[in-house]
Amino acid sequence: MERPPLDIVALRLCHCRAATAASEGALHIAVQLYRACLEAAERREDAQAIHFFAQKLSDCYEKMGLRDKASSFEALAKA
């Protein structure tokens, strides 16, 4: 897997692809893309983006029925 995008434009494009995948029911792809976004947000040290992408991951895992993973990302989103 390639490194998460650092520049804001690449991050936004990755987020848009993740949102599209989630809305189309391709949750495994959405999770992969949202994880890349979360890693980029962590590397940028952007707390607001970290919380946002952690919540998106929590939502995806909840829809997938993976409550334990959803809970861990929900905790990160609220930290």
State each model region's role.
Residues 5-6, 45:
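Structural signature of alpha-solenoid helical repeat scaffolds
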Residues 12-13, 52, 72:
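Residue register of alpha-helical TPR repeats
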Residues 38-40, 78-79:
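Amphipathic alpha-helical segments of tetratricopeptide repeats
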Residues 55-79:
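TPR/TPR-like (Sel1-like) alpha-helical repeat modules
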